Amino acid sequence: METGVAYFGNRILRHVQADLDDIVAHNCTYVVHTFSEEDQSYYAQTMGAIVKATHSAGLKAWIDPWGVGGVFGGEALSLYAARFPQRQQVLSTGETLPVACPNWPEFRAAMREWVDAALSTGADVLFWDEPHFAIPARFDWYNGASDAWACHCVACQYLYRERFGEELPAVHDTGVRAFRQERLLDFLADITGYAAVQGGRNALCLLPIADDDRHGLPWRAAAALPNVHIFGTDPYWFFTNLTPEEHVGQQTARAVELCRYIGKPTQIWVQAFSVPEGREDEIATAIEVAAAGGAEYIAAWGYDGCGHMSSIASARPEVVWDMIGRAYRRVRDA
């Protein structure tokens, strides 16, 4: 059983080292460090020192393309999307979003540069978090059509025409869904393959939604990619009407069944941000449900209940963090 936590928002090494000691004291075995475009540009060597300190603390170091291109999960903004508006994603309505389209060869080349930088830190695993086409509703400033979807850029139109022999429609239908899924799978195969050639290990986290959901990816096809070594999902139940037993239990069962079939370990993420006061004990329940369900890797997002990031801070981050440490000890001792 491997137990981890996401860590971000601090690049001052002596403070990171103190936090790493705290992470060890809370019964973690690995840390998922975010590595945004800003980190790649300005903190590359610093991140190498942070990864080295992580190893010195006896922890494994994972690294996450946090918000890179806007294609992966995370609050970090994308400089790439701002620099190259011609490669931004275009909605079916014709509006553009500040997100890069993974179908542009130039963006894929930029992702290979990210892989080079990430591996140069000495990280043990590259963590590909929630790869997706843009979801308009996630932008709090978006007030356009509720049924708009991405992407309808020049690259997507060309590739759709090549694939289906017709123009990319403005209405989202089964053909569009299949096209989007195929292209994201191709993108993931490309970047994980590039990393693996250089000796990198890849972990993939997909949203806990149905394969046929508009924003879903087929789990089996994604998990079975030859250079995906660990597969998981992030059933954050505070955003649902479900209990942790229900949501975490159902999604853990789904992921573990698949991973056992294809012979890969499972990772389950537990929500440790935006936790309401008085519900912190649900985190322990979620950890125990994931462990009992057979997940080999569990991780919490994020360190110290995300108390340092006001937009997603838990109401009582110190209680959240204490709950994680106690639950991790129990599942590791079981």
Feature locations, PLM:
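Substrate-binding cleft of secreted/luminal carbohydrate-active enzymes
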Residues: 235, 240, 267-332
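Aromatic- and acidic-residue-enriched segments that line the glycan-binding/catalytic groove
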Residues: 70-94, 129-167
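Substrate-binding cleft/loops of secretory-pathway carbohydrate-active enzymes
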Residues: 136, 191-245, 274-293
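Aromatic-lined carbohydrate-recognition surfaces of secreted/lumenal glycan-active proteins
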Residues: 4-9, 62-66, 126-131, 172-216, ...
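Catalytic domains of carbohydrate-active enzymes, especially glycoside hydrolases
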Residues: 9-40, 120-125, 224-231, 289-298
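Aromatic-lined substrate-binding rim segments of carbohydrate-active enzymes
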Residues: 19-82, 176-196
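Active-site-adjacent "subsite" loops/lids of carbohydrate-active enzymes
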Residues: 62-121, 170-177, 189, 281-283
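The substrate-binding groove and active-site-proximal loops of carbohydrate-active enzymes
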Residues: 4-11, 32-41, 93-112, 170-185, ...
